[in-house]
């Protein structure tokens, strides 16, 4: 895609702080991080979201996170944990599939919580979802 920011980063048209790169994926620091080392992992081919990305690409990305990128973050930044998140459609600012790796530190104040008071009763939701 010509106007995709992440495609421009892959092509080298926009600078980035690369953490890891191979022929299929690129991992780089998020310029609006939630913690030190907040990294975005993207496929080098353009797919808009999880649902348009081939399973083998997703599998490769997850394996690369586990075996290549996480060890870099752990060894270089001495992280205590890792929050992994990914948005589709609503909440997805860049329409190029990407996974957020948010390093966690024992001293951080980052919380991944939502206001459950605005959510429907779990029994009502279950009734809508269960098979008849």
Label the predicted regions.
Residues 1-132:
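HIT superfamily nucleotide-processing domains
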